[in-house]
């Protein structure tokens, strides 16, 4: 006799002994407790090479869904990017080389935009640093980094660690031009008022300002803001101007798509009024469409 089988995927439900920051162990879940007590529980590996991620990298919902749906291990795009960087191939990409040539001719700035985080869900630190190094190796003299802080896939006040790591590895000529929480620039729910606040800091160099990244973090924490919700601040430079180039560094598309569309599309439905800078190039680690 055949019986129906229901596969229910509960994002965020996992097994970890430590109770700190662990909603699962602290929650009241009588049904799951009964299943566990009756021995109706087994475990799947959901991180690292078991799901096509780098060894030791935690998994996430998108990765889990992809592997479950495929019924096999699927190498993630982050792994492909990592290999490209390790093999020294990133600086050989034609689009990046063309952008470098144009910037050398007009004295423009390359703007790198990415989530500065060790979470590994939307970006990787080695990708951010590798991109800056590849640009510097091509002779790009002005590299402005627009840092988006996490606090969603990482601890809520851990940005200092990742910002310090980024700053210590940036090549000569690179600097952090703006800083703000992912809540704004990485919105994916058509809440354009959030994106507009990030736009003001990143593109127009307007709104809240700070002297350096650490001062902004300290001020945000004193105001009760956590990393995800840090008010976008302009730090250095004149924003994104005509003749500049932009390179988005997140490898996951869903939370880059809106900001990228605002920067490249005139008739994006629902988007706020703005003047788009005339860029010589707008690049991405992946296709964000």
Mark where each language-model region is.
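Long, well-ordered, tryptophan-enriched scaffold segments
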Residues: 104, 154-241, 245, 254-256, ...
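Active-site nucleophile/metal-coordination loop of metallo-enzymes that catalyze phosphate/sulfate
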Residues: 1-5, 13-183, 193, 197, ...
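Short glycine-rich anion-binding loops that position phosphate/pyrophosphate groups of nucleotides
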Residues: 13, 253-254
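Short, hydrophobic/glycine-enriched beta-strand segments
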Residues: 4-10, 247-250
């Amino acid at each position: 006799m055949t019986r129906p089988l229901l596969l229910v995927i509960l994002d965020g439900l996992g097994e970890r002994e430590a109770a700190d920051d662990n909603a699962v162990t602290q929650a009241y879940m009588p049904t799951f407790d009964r299943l566990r007590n009756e021995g109706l529980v087994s475990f799947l590996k959901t991180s690292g090479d078991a799901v096509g991620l780098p060894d030791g990298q935690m998994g996430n919902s998108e990765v889990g869904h992809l592997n479950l749906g495929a019924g096999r291990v699927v190498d993630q795009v982050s792994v492909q990017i990592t290999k490209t960087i390790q093999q020294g191939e990133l600086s050989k990409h034609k689009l990046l080389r063309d952008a470098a040539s144009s910037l050398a001719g007009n004295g423009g700035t390359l703007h790198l935009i990415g989530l500065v985080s060790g979470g590994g869900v939307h970006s990787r630190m080695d990708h951010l640093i590798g991109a800056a190094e590849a640009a510097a190796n091509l002779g790009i003299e002005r590299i402005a980094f627009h840092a988006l802080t996490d606090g969603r896939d990482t601890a809520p006040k851990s940005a200092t660690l990742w910002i310090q790591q980024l700053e210590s590895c940036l090549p000569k000529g690179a600097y952090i031009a703006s800083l703000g929480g992912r809540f704004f620039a990485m919105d994916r729910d058509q809440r354009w008022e959030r994106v507009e606040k990030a736009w003001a800091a990143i593109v127009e160099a307007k709104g809240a300002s700070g002297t350096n990244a650490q001062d902004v973090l300290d001020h945000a924490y004193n105001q009760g803001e956590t990393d995800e919700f840090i008010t976008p601040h302009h730090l250095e430079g004149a924003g994104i101007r005509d003749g500049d180039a932009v390179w988005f560094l997140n490898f996951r598309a869903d939370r880059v798509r809106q900001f990228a569309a605002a920067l490249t599309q005139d008739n994006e439905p629902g988007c706020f009024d703005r003047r788009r800078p005339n860029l010589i190039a707008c690049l991405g680690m992946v296709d964000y469409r």
